[in-house]
From Swiss-Prot:
Monomer. This is Valine--tRNA ligase. Residues 806-871 form a coiled coil. Residues 1-23 are annotated as: Disordered. One of its GO terms (biological process) is valyl-tRNA aminoacylation. Belongs to the class-I aminoacyl-tRNA synthetase family. ValS type 1 subfamily. The lineage of its organism: Bacteria, Bacillati, Actinomycetota, Actinomycetes, Kitasatosporales.
Amino acid sequence: MTENSQQQPPASEPELPTQYAPADVEGTLYERWVERGYFEADAKSDKPPFTVVIPPPNVTGSLHLGHAFEHTLIDALTRRKRMQGYETLWQPGMDHAGIATQNVVERELGKEGKSRHDLGRAAFVERVWQWKAESGGQISGQMRRLGDGVAWSRERFTMDEGLSQAVQTIFKKLYDDELIYRAERIINWCPRCLTAISDIEVEYQDDDGELVSMKYGEGDDTIVVATTRAETMLGDTAVAVHPDDERYKHLVGKTIRLPLTERFIPVVADTHVDPEFGTGAVKVTPAHDPNDFEIGQRHNLPNIAVMDEHAVITVSGPFQGLDRLEARSAIVAALRAEGRIVAEKRPYVHSVGHCSRCKTTIEPRLSMQWWVKVGPLAKAAGDAVREGKVKIHPQEMEKRYFDWVDNLHDWCISRQLWWGHRIPVWYGPNGEVVCVGPDDEVPTGEGWSQDTDVLDTWFSSGLWPFSTLGWPEQTESLAKFYPNSVLVTGYDILFFWVARMMMFGLYAMDGTPPFHTIALHGMVRDQFGKKMSKSFGNAVNPLDWMDKYGSDALRFTLARGANPGVDVPIGEDWVQGSRNFANKIWNATRFALMNGATVEGELPPVEQQSATDRWILSRLNATVAEVDALYDDYQFAKLSDALFHFAWDEVFDWYVELSKTTFMGGGEAAKVSGRVLGEVLDVTLRLLHPIVPFVTETLWTTLTGGESVVIADWPVDSGFRDQAAEKEIETLQSVITEVRRFRADQGLQPGQRVPARLTLDDTALAPHEAAIRQLLRLQPEGEDFAATATLPVAGATVALDLSGTIDIVAERKRLAKDLAAAEKEKAQAGAKLGNEAFLAKAPDHVVDKIRGRLAKADEDIARIQAQLDRMPEA
């Protein structure tokens, strides 16, 4: 466990400042790590590889708590693997973020009174590159602040030349394999961004709308349909009913007049229609609804588009030129004037899709676009998990993954933007269509032009695990570091990004999945569990907390909340608590160094060690084993808790405190404990380093004289256990804890000394008598000693003389008042829980809260009564 090639005894008596100031060391330490190349990856190394990619943040972005959370987990994994002897590669980079970046630069142009069309495509793209050079590197500096151990020399951007070649290569391969095609289909159209967006980029929310029922046809041949989008009725080409619906069988096959027009449309029978919903009849607008489009395909209905790309009505007549919402009101008014409105419901709350970027209401629109045929790709992505080639943590997330990949529709990959990877297809003057690979010659001559669309951002980021390693070239890095060892990412982009990487990785890399493991984490929320958002007023800039408390404090807080696949609540007071933990580590190490703690030489033989020494070494090895197992299972919260409680409770609060009497006594025992304490701190600091790298680097190098804990050996469980010593110290802890609790109950100050008679019933406690007296602030009994309280505790009896130390009368009066309050609380809570009418109406969380109040009242009553029973009569 203690082997460490970087460890040397300090050259001289080490000194640490009295207080830890993160701002004084973090920047310097990080730059030193980078300069020494600790984070770089060598493709020629004989070490086993450990590879993980950064989920590439948008070039428009800055570090938010979600990034900080994710990066903390990845960095912890990578730092541990580096210490374990792996050739580690944490691949950094950024995403070009097509829509988001174009929107940002367009807003900048707007401030100058210009649009992208004023510049033209080439000049606009050049302007975006200029913006990226000036503003796009903000997040890199923030990653350094957090301590991200990425291989900066390998930083990539999804629009880099090499990655662009990868995009062109896989597009050509998919096209040649007939897995990419161009077709006119219904897509999600954003009238603000003026581009198609994918299903997973549509955010649904409940909006107040209207539900209008209107009558189609004339005379006896009429039928009532209901819609929330009356403006689309101008493009209706049929009314559909279920073939088994007896109400409408006489109309199937007939044509009826479409109101407000001179057109007649057929009534068709289709099993898609639910006869139990509404009137059992639906209007069919194939050019403006995905389900209607499918009905139209089955019945050979024409597609009539009624809106342009700005969602403005184009059909000639009184509604031409109106925005869709204006047209909706005007059309309903016109129908009402004709007496065709049967019913109107306002407001009618229903789920409406919005663009995730600009929040504009999405318009389903028939459009010619490029598509990926995902069937065979999605099947391979599902099979890789089913067959165990890729594992998902936590396992219960597999169902969500399968639900997605097993039900994927073909993916619309074209976007009507200027910023992005332009589709590598050229059109000739005579209808020729040529897909051009990176090694192909571009068609030239009069009449040839390239497709104006660009690819969906997720197309290029789907290649990230292998394009960043040089693919399609067969590079040393690709051979060494593919597939990735693990992907750490949020469950919220399981479908956006993870599934696409799986599909493309398996396809491009001959069936080899892009990673062995997918470790999913939750979303960061505020301390009340609410989503963080600027609009909610609860968004936090992590740099503010890092400035105030240090990067280690933020990292430890985030790791301690990271249960697999579960959302993470976080509040500033929790970060402050983690800062206190860093200070505790600092102060304990400083005390140890001032009292002779050392890593020099071998550990003293077991027979020279005290029970306290053997106990802490036993617990140390058990903690190493526990932390290792939890790391391997991606249980960051549990391993952080294990480290916290071992370091704070067992090392600092118990071992260091118990050792103080040994150090004060001097001699050989003090030397032995000094070496044991040095060992424990050395290993503990190495265990903590992946999560809190800065404070551990400062302390470990001071303690050991080693070059850097970044490249130190990861601790290994030696197998040493001493159950007898553990039991002995547990008994000792019980004695001290029980008497401390009694002292606190009696209102004694922590440092207040009390005359006491200490009788050790357990002989194993005899060597600890001095420590017991010191920690409990017990002073020897004098001639006038009179025991006013006797405490029989595990292995010992402690008689205390409290006369003159507390006012017995006042204390009994205070406790009696507290007891009465607790009994009143119990009665009130019990009455509510005994009220059946209340229980029937109250929400579960309210009932649970009252049950908690009752349980606490019971605990308080028992505790206060015990204090009164132990207290002498006045």
